[in-house]
Each structure stands twice: as C-alpha cells, then as structure tokens.
C-alpha cells in the first residue's frame, strides 16, 4: 500500500503517467514524477551511455554575422520569454531555475541584459567553455511501458530560453523547412490531421494498406553533419546556432543512486528534451520524407507518407506494400536511422 493507505502504483502505471507528460511536452512534470520514485536499478548508466552512439562532428564552417534587425527581433522574443516563464520547471545541471531568471524582469536594465545574454548564447557568441557548460543537461532515464529506457535531457535554463527564443523567432521558417510531410512541428493539431486524413484515405480505398514505422533512438543517432547540411539548405537563419551547438561534443550528466554525477558524451543527434530539437530533427529528416514520397508515387500514384517526428506512416495499395516497406527502411537507413522492426505494423 501507499503511505496514505491507497494502492501503490505499478511500474507500468508510473511509466504511462510519465509518458503522458512527455507526449504533452510537460518535461518538468515528467521529471518530477520520476525523481519522487525509487531510483532505477544499477546498470542504467551503462544503458544510457549505449544510447548515445559516437559519431563524427560536423566540419567547421564560416557563418556570417547576424544583422542588427534580426538581433533586435531575437532580443524582443527573449524578453517575452523571460516574462512568462513556466513555474516549477525542473532545473538543469547547475541548479538554476526559471524563477531565478524571471526575477530580472523587475528591473528594466537587468531584463535587457539578460535577454542579450540569451541571444548571445543562442548565436554562439560566447566562449567555448561557456557553451560547453550550458549546453550540457541532466539526463533522466524514463522507463517506457515496455520496460526499456527513454533518455530525457533537462538542459540549463539558459539553453531552454535560447531554444525557445529561436523557435519563436523562426517559427515560419521552421515550418517550411520541415516540409509538407512532417506534422509534428509547425502544424496546428498535426496528430489529429494525420489521423483524420488516414481515416479518410482508408475509407475511400479500403483495399489500401497502412504501414507504420518507428525509428530506434532516433534523436540520438541522426548524424549531426546531416542536420547541419539540411539546416544550411532549408533554414539558414538557424546556422549560427547549429554550428555553435552541434559542432562540439556535448557533455551531459546522470545522477544515479549516489550524489555523484557521471558524464555522458554526445557527438550525434540532438537532445530529446531541448525545445529546438524536434525542429532540428524534423529538418534533418525532411529530404528523406520527400524521397520516400517520390519513391512511393513511382510504385503507385495514390501513395502517401506522413511523419510525426520519427513515427512514419505510409498509405499504399496492398499490392505494393512489401516494396513500400523496403523503400522506407532503406531511405531511413541512409540518414542514419534504424527502423525498429518490433514496432513496425500493418493494417
């Protein structure tokens, strides 16, 4: 029984609760839900390290200066975010919270200075040591309903403010860069759109087959060079950030049962938990989705592809279902992703 006399939650119920918070982007609540429970068994650290595969860092590229106009717009976005911070969100590795940063809004000069710092960090206009210290995150191991782990990075408040500033300022550019087949970023009610569109397609053509794909550890495995190249082509306004944030090794920390933090290094992918990561991942995936769509249309003109981050669904005539499956798997492998065969489904 629970301390209050009620029934204790099972591990599966706890995992479902945390997973629901994650799906609603309530990372702070998910983290709080985890840390109040008993720590995971030993061996979690090794499992987490294995989920951050090594890879080559992007080659250095020159990035032009940010115009005064764009800088002013970014500062305005940062000021807004400093004034409406989320309450009781979990802190990053250095213990700083949004409430600490929110206090600067009580003084106009401090407010402006803090916004300038957020923008400088977003554009990489600070020392390498400062970047490294504030790009790192606390890693939490959230257990999925199937018993496997999901690594969640709870970054510094400065990083989260900078990421949200970039998302706010580049909202339309990000939406266009993600492409027409991505429904998780820049789309209002994107999940509902996918569901209703697929329902309509299958009602109109009941002989079609729906194939669902899920990529294993997708955020942590996409090559950073691929992301950088995609951003340069599709959303060049984000290049200063991507060059500064992804061109060096990121060091995260995991606190186990003791009080000592163990480092976890990342040289591939983007951090699941950073507000900018879904956009960067989706931009990196956009060209692959376009190629999948063209490949499917070559098999059957009525074919369609839909993506909700790394969850990909295709609707094709049953006669070309096997060929469509092969085309999707090969294309995703080409961008460094591995389809989880155990989660592949057809109906």
Where are these regions (language model features)?
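Short helix/loop segment immediately N-terminal to the Walker
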Residues: 294-305
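Short beta-strand->loop micro-motif that forms the acidic, two-metal-ion catalytic signature
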Residues: 311-315
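Short amphipathic alpha-helix segments
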Residues: 282-295
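Residue-level marker for buried hydrophobic side chains located in beta-strands
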Residues: 211, 307-308
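Polymerase palm active-site segment centered on the conserved acidic dipeptide of motif C
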Residues: 237-244, 304-306, 316-347
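Short, contiguous pre-domain boundary segments
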Residues: 57-65
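Conserved pre-catalytic core of RNA-dependent polymerases
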Residues: 1-13, 17-22, 52, 64-284
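Extended, charge-enriched "interface" segments that sit outside catalytic cores
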Residues: 8-32, 38-57
């Amino acid at each position: 029984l629970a301390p209050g006399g009620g029934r204790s939650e099972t591990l599966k119920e706890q995992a479902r609760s945390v997973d629901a918070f994650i799906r609603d982007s309530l990372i702070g609540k998910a983290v709080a839900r985890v840390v109040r429970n008993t720590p995971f068994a030993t061996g979690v650290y090794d499992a987490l390290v294995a989920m951050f595969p090594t890879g080559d860092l992007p080659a250095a590229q020159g990035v032009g200066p940010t115009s005064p106009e764009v800088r002013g717009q970014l500062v305005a976005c940062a000021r807004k975010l400093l004034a409406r911070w989320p309450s009781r969100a979990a802190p990053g590795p250095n213990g700083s919270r949004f409430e600490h940063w929110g206090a600067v809004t009580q003084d106009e000069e401090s407010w402006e200075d803090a916004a300038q710092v957020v923008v400088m960090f977003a554009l990489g206009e600070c020392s390498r040591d400062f970047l490294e210290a504030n790009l790192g995150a606390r890693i939490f191991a959230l257990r999925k309903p199937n018993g496997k782990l999901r690594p969640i990075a709870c970054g510094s408040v400065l990083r989260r403010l900078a990421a949200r500033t970039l998302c706010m300022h580049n909202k339309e550019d990000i939406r266009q860069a993600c492409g027409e087949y991505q429904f998780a970023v820049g789309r209002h009610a994107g999940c509902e759109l996918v569901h209703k569109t697929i329902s309509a397609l299958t009602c109109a053509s009941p002989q079609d087959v729906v194939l669902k794909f899920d990529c294993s550890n997708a955020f942590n495995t996409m090559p950073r060079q691929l992301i950088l190249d995609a951003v340069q082509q599709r959303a060049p306004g984000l290049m200063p950030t991507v060059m500064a944030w992804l061109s060096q090794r990121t060091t995260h920390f995991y606190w186990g049962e003791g009080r000592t933090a163990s480092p976890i290094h990342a040289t591939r992918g983007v951090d699941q938990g950073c507000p900018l990561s879904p956009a960067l991942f989706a931009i990196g995936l956009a060209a692959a989705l376009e190629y999948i769509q063209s490949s499917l249309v070559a098999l059957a003109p009525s074919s369609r592809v839909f993506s909700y981050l790394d969850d990909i669904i295709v609707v094709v005539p049953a006669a070309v279902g096997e060929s469509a499956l092969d085309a999707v798997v090969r294309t995703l492998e080409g961008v460094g992703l591995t389809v989880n065969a155990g989660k592949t489904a057809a109906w």
